[in-house]
A protein has these predicted regions:
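CBM-like carbohydrate-recognition segments
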Residues: 1-40
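Boundary/entry segment of secreted carbohydrate-active catalytic domains
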Residues: 41-95, 100
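Aromatic-lined substrate-binding rim segments of carbohydrate-active enzymes
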Residues: 91-94, 98-158
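The substrate-binding groove and active-site-proximal loops of carbohydrate-active enzymes
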Residues: 103-116, 167-180, 217-222
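An active-site-proximal structural segment forming one wall of the substrate-binding cleft
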Residues: 124-129, 167-201, 227, 231-234
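Short, low-complexity, polybasic intrinsically disordered segments
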Residues: 214-239
Length: 248
């Protein structure tokens, strides 16, 4: 083991010990150093398979929306694990609450926001924060395979074009009225949640069925690239802490 980029002819034994041990400590491993009667030091390592490191953008998340049961957090605070013969608290293992829910939940009426008015949404978010967890979000606008319309009614009332599936409306993402209303919402969303102390990541897309881009429908399929660039730029300009990957 030697410092990265160092000339091997100039590396001393002390330098090797300091840099070598420091590198493996940073990796979160248990270390045993064995000195021998040579100029080199040998390091044996064993992976730490028990400690939860909590590295950014890694580890376990809990999926949720505003419709979780009233005892949601009570259940997750007491999950029985047969191998342990006891219960565990899920927030000791999962560091992030991942909320994937409708635009209409976050923004039921123009200028009205669910993080202020929706008691169930507020409760599930506060439960995560009370347990020292972080937040992540996906905003879904497509109503296909949904119990309720995912886009707020005021968007369609303003004239946004849409298609229907099973009696529910979904907006065309290349419609200018949809884009105007959605951009206004994301700006408000950013004012509330563009905070790295609370938020782990925000999906920088959310269009399409389940918020997945490979299911998209357009007024004109030729607008596909334009829509992609529009929504990515919108999230990047409003939210510094986004996960901008899309299923496309």
């Amino acid at each position: 083991v030697q410092p990265i980029g160092a000339d091997p002819r100039k590396v001393t034994r002390d330098m090797t010990e300091v840099y070598g041990v420091g590198a493996f400590l940073a990796a979160g491993c248990q270390i045993y150093k064995m000195a021998v009667d040579t100029e080199a030091d040998y390091i044996k390592i064993w992976p730490d398979k028990k400690t939860m490191q909590g590295n950014p953008l890694s580890g376990w998340v809990i999926y949720a929306n505003e419709n979780v049961s009233d005892d949601f957090w009570k259940k997750y605070d007491h999950i029985y694990v047969p191998e342990k013969g006891t219960t565990v608290k899920i927030s000791d293992y999962a560091r992030t609450l991942y909320i994937r829910t409708h635009w209409s939940t976050f923004n039921p009426a123009e200028g009205v926001y669910g993080w202020d008015t929706d008691e169930k949404l507020k409760k599930v978010i506060q439960g995560a924060l009370d347990r020292g967890m972080r937040l992540s979000f996906r905003v879904i606008v497509d109503s296909r395979d949904r119990k309720n319309e995912a886009t707020p009614a005021y968007v369609f009332d303003a004239g946004a074009k849409y298609y229907t599936d099973n009696g529910k409306r979904s907006p065309y993402p290349d419609d200018p009225i949809f884009q105007e209303k959605y951009a206004k919402f994301i700006e408000a969303f950013a004012q509330k949640y563009n905070n790295p102390d609370l938020v782990e990541f925000i999906d920088g897309y959310g269009l399409g069925k389940w918020g997945e881009a490979h299911t998209m429908k357009y007024i004109d399929p030729k607008n596909r690239e334009t829509v992609f660039n529009w929504i990515i730029d919108l999230y990047l300009n409003c939210l510094l802490y986004t996960s901008d990957a899309a299923d496309e």
